[in-house]
Amino acid sequence: MDSLSSMGFQTASFFLILLFLFYHLPCVPSQQERSRLCKPFQCGDITVGFPFWGENRQSDCGHFSLKLNCNKPSNTTSLTISGHNYSVLHIDNKSNILSLSRQDFSGPFCSASFSSTPLRSDLFQNLQPYRNLTVFYMCDPRRHFFGNFTCPVKGLGSVVQNSTYRKLCDKSFSVTVPTSYVPEEEALNLTHLESVLRKGLEVKLKISEMSGQECVTTDGNSGFTRFCCTNVSGPEISCLTSITTMNNGTYSDNRPFLVTIGTVLGSILCVCVVLFLAFYLNERRIAKAARIQHLEALGTLRGYNYKQIKKITKSFTEVVGRGGFGTVYRGRLRDGRKVAVKVLKDSKGNCEDFINEVASMSQTSHVNIVTLLGFCYEGSKRAIIYEFLENGSLDQSLNLDVSTLYGIALGVARGLEYLHYGCKTRIVHFDIKPQNVLLDENLRPKVADFGLAKLCEKQESILSLLDTRGTIGYIAPELFSRMYGSVSHKSDVYSYGMLVLEMIGARNKERVQNADPNNSSAYFPDWIYKDLENFDNTRLLGDGLTREEEKNAKKMILVGLWCIQFRPSDRPSMNKVVEMMEGSLDSLDPPPKPLLHMPMQNNNAESSQLSVESSIYSEV
C-alpha cells in the first residue's frame, strides 16, 4: 500500500506541475507585436491590409492565395495566380476591386508565354462583360488568315473570336478582354489587342455580404480585423467587417480569445492523457503486486531462474508432451530426481493460467494429486517443475484389466474429492480427462494439469466463468449453456463420469464395433444404458471376468451414468462418488436415463482453451 500511495502522490505532483505550466504559458503576443507582424502592405501607390499579405506583412495576416510582391526599384506590385504573374495596377479598399494585367503581356506580344490564364473563380468575380479571344499560332503559311501576325519563333498566327482555324494551326490559347474593347469585325488588329491586354481587367474579391462597418481595436483606433475568415462553408473569403482604410497600422484582433480557447482545450486533453497514463500504470502496478503477493504466498516452494531450467532439461532436448499452454520436457534435478518441466508459451494472456496452476498445485498434498516441486517466473519465461511419472498418462493404458482400471477410477475420485473438500480453498479442475491422469510405477493415478483450474471458497456453490473451458467430450453441459444449470464443482463430476465410462468402453471397443458395425459411432453412454436395461453386459464387459471384476465393472458403469446426468443437481458430489465406488454394488440404485442425444464429438478435439495433446505424457 505504501508503494501505491507513493505513486498516487507522484501522479498528483506531476498533475499540479502541469497545471502550473499551462497557467503561466503566454497565450498571445503583445499589441505592439501584433501591430509589427501585421502592419499594412505598402508598395508605390498601393497600401492594403487583409486579405492580402507579403513582404513585411506576415503570411497569417491574410489569405494564403493573395500574396503581394513589391518589385523594386519600380515600386510596382505583382500577384501570382495559378502560376502566372499579374501586375496589380490598383486596389480599391472600400469596394474590394482590383485592376490586374498579365505581366507577360506588358511587352511585345510575341514575347508572351502564349498560354491561357483563367482567373480563379473562387477568389474573383468579373465586374463587366468579358469575351474570350482565341489566338492561333504555328499555322499553315500557305493559307491566308484574318487578323494574322508573325512571330520569329511562333510562326504565322491569327487572332479571332471563334475557332475557325483550329484545324489549320498547331497551337492555340485564349485571352480574356472586356467586351467593350472588342470591335465588331471577326478579326482583331494585333496592335489594338496589345493595348487592351496592357490595360488589364477589373475584378472584385469574393467577400461575403456582411459589411458596412469598421472594426475597432481595444485602444479605439480604426483598422482591420486579422481573423476575417470565419464560418467558411466553401473556398470563398468570408469577413465579418469591410476592408477599410487602415490607421496607425493597428487592427482589432480576436486572436486572444481563439488562442485562449485552444490553450484550454489543449490543457484538458493533456490532463486527460496524463490521468489515463497514471491510471494504466497504476493498474499494471497493482496487478504486478498482486501476482508477486500470490507467488510469495507459495511459502517454501522453490523458485528457479530460466538458466537453471535450461540446465535441468539439458537445453530442452527431450520432449515428453505438448499441449495448448506449453511443452513438457524430461529433466533431472541436482539430487538426481527425475522431473517433468512444463514450459509455458510466451504469451501475455497465460499469466493468469500460470498463477492458477502454481497456486492450485502448491496448496495440494495428496497421494492422488501430482506433486509440484518448483516454478520459474522470470519476465515472460514461465515454467512448472513437478514429479516425473514413468507410466505416462491414462489414455495410453486404457486396455488394462478391470481390477486395475477400477483402482485407477477410485484413486481419481479420491483425488477430486480432496480438491473439492480437502483443501483450504476449493479447487475446481475443469479439465478431467485420460490425458490429465498420470500413472506412477505402481499404476497409482495422480490428477494433473491445473491450467484451467479455478479456486473458490467452499461456501461458493456457483462459479462465474467468462469462457468455456475443458475438452470437448468431457465438458459438462452447463459450461456450454446455462440452461442446464449453474457452473460449479459438479462440472468436475460430469467429466469424471465420462472418464470412467470411457475406461470401461475403450477396453472392449473392438468387440462393440463388431457387434453393431452400423452404430459403432453412436454416443457410447447410449448403448451402455441400453445394455444395462436389458441386463446384457456381454459386448461391454466380454467374457472371462471373475465375479469380483464383474461387480467392479458394473459399479463403474452405474457411477459413471450417475455422474453424467445433464442437470448438475442430479449428479452426486465427489465425496458421494467415493462412497458409491467403495460401497457394494447392491447399494447402488439404477440411475435415471441421461439425455442421450449428445452430438458425435471427437474426444481428442479441444475447445479454444486447449489444443490437442500429442504425447504419451500429458502436460500438468
UniProtKB/Swiss-Prot annotation:
Q: Which residues lie on this side of the membrane: Extracellular?
A: 31-256
InterPro entries linked to this entry: Kinase-like_dom_sf, LRK10/LRL21-25-like, Prot_kinase_dom, Protein_kinase_ATP_BS, Ser-Thr/Tyr_kinase_cat_dom, Ser/Thr_kinase_AS, WAK_GUB
The membrane-topology field of this record reads: Single-pass type I membrane protein
Q: Which SUPFAM superfamilies match?
A: Protein kinase-like (PK-like)
Which intervals hold domain Protein kinase?
314-596
> Cellular component GO terms, alphabetically?
membrane
Q: Which residues bind ATP?
A: 320-328, 342
Annotated spans, Disordered: 586-620
The stretches that face the Cytoplasmic side, renumbered to this chain, are 278-620
The active site consists of: 431
Sorted keywords for this record are: ATP-binding, Glycoprotein, Kinase, Membrane, Nucleotide-binding, Receptor, Serine/threonine-protein kinase, Signal, Transferase, Transmembrane, Transmembrane helix
Where would I find glycosylation on this chain? Answer: 75, 85, 93, 132, 148, 162, 189, 231, 248
Q: Which domain of life is it from?
A: Eukaryota
Which residues does UniProt assign to the signal peptide? Answer: 1-30
EC number(s) per UniProt? 2.7.11.1
Q: What is the protein name given in its UniProt record?
A: LEAF RUST 10 DISEASE-RESISTANCE LOCUS RECEPTOR-LIKE PROTEIN KINASE-like 2.3
